[in-house]
Amino acid sequence: QAQSPDSGKEMNIDEIINEVVKFKNCYRITITGGEPLLQEAELEELVNRLSMEYDISIETNGAHPIKKSWPVSWVVDYKCSSSGMKKKMLLKNYKVVGTHDIIKFVIGDKQDFEDAVYLISRGASIDPVYAFSPMFKDGKPVVEINELLKWIEEEEALEYLRIVINVQIHKFLNIA
C-alpha cells in the first residue's frame, strides 16, 4: 500500500476541476489511482469537461475495459506472471491501444519479460509505446535495469518497436 488509508480527500467533479484550474500554464493531466475506471461514469464526465482545455492521460491497471472513444491517451498496465494478477488482464485492451498510448510492463523476472514479449508478438496493438519498468521490493529493483536493458537488446521481436524504460524515481528514493 503506497499511502495510508486516511490520506487524500474525497471530492466531487466540480471540486476536482476547481483544483485543476488553479495550476496556471498546465496543459496536461494524468488521472491515476487506485483504479480510475472503477468510477467510470464520473471519470467520463470529468474527461468530457476537461478535454477541451487539457491533454488527458489515464493510467489503468489493465483489468477494466478502456474506452477508446474517449479523447484521452491511455497508459495500460499489463500484470505479468510474478504479480499473480496476469489472469485478470483484459486482453482486448491491448488490441485497441494506439500510437498515443502506452502499454506498461512491470518486470520482476525473466518470465515476466517473456510474458511481455509474447503479448507484443501477438500483435498487441497499433504501434503503442511499450514501457518496461523494473519491479521493486524493499526499496530495490528486483531486476537490475542493466539486465532488463540487455534482455530488450537481445530480443529480436522488439527490434523496431517503440520501447522505453520506465524508471519510477520515487521508488529509487524509497518515497511511497
Q: Could you tell me what each predicted segment is?
A:
Residues 41-130:
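Radical SAM/AdoMet-radical enzyme domain recognition
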Residues 1-73:
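Conserved Radical SAM active-site core
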Residues 18-23, 109-176:
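Auxiliary Fe-S-binding modules of radical SAM enzymes
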Residues 2-4, 20, 27, 69-71, ...:
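Residue-level signal for the start and early helices of compact helical domains
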Residues 34-36, 61-63, 79-81, 106-108, ...:
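Active-site beta-loop-alpha junctions enriched in small/polar residues
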Residues 8-12, 89, 111, 140-143:
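Short coil/turn linker and secondary-structure boundary residues
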